[in-house]
Every structure is written in C-alpha cells, then in structure tokens.
Amino acid sequence: MYAVTFDLDTNCLNENAVNLSKVYSDIRKFMEQHGFKWQQGSVYFGDETINAVTCVATVQILAKQIPSFAVCVKDVRMLKIEENNDLMPAIKIVL
C-alpha cells in the first residue's frame, strides 16, 4: 500500500490569500477522486489501484490542478506501507 503525506506552509497560504479550510477540502476531494482515502491530518492511503508510478503522477496532477499546493507545500512524501495495524486496541487495554 502507498501513502502520500504532506505539510503545507500556512504562512504561505495566508500570504497568498488562500483559505485554509478550502484548500484542505479541495485537496481531500482531489485525492479521493484519484484512489486515495483520507487517513488523518495530511495523510492519504492509496487503494489497491495505486502503485509507485500512479502515486507520483497523482501528486504531479495535484500540483497542477491546485496551484496553492505547489506554491506552499513544505514537504511531500510517498510512503510504502507494508502493514497497516490499528493500535487503538492496545490503548484500550491500558484504560
């Protein structure tokens, strides 16, 4: 499974008069339309159709379609996830 994670510079967004809520909403909508599911924050997990090439291509298209992403992104990474383990049961054990 592949994932994309990124960090947007909120100062840059503000300086460019970009509405924070709208840009994050637009990014989420775009990612969901391209085979990714929002996980948390700025982390999106790809579905079974996503491989390394489609992951990179998706980020490139995102940068073209949402220019504020390209201008204000501080860090963007593609991750390959070998396992996706939910640790919530471990937290509940100690409560």
Curated annotation (Swiss-Prot):
UniProt KW keywords: Hydrolase, Nuclease, Virulence
EC number: 3.1.-.-
GO molecular function, one term: nuclease activity
InterPro entries reported for this sequence: VapD (IPR016368), Virulence_VapD/CRISPR_Cas2 (IPR019199)
Functional description taken from the UniProt entry: Cleaves ssRNA, mostly between U:A.
Other observations noted: There is no ortholog for HP0967 in strain J99.
Family statement drawn from the similarity comment of this UniProt entry: Belongs to the VapD ribonuclease family.
Assembly and oligomerization: Homodimer.
Protein name (database record): Endoribonuclease VapD homolog
Species for this entry: Helicobacter pylori (strain ATCC 700392 / 26695)
Lineage: Bacteria, Pseudomonadati, Campylobacterota, Epsilonproteobacteria, Campylobacterales
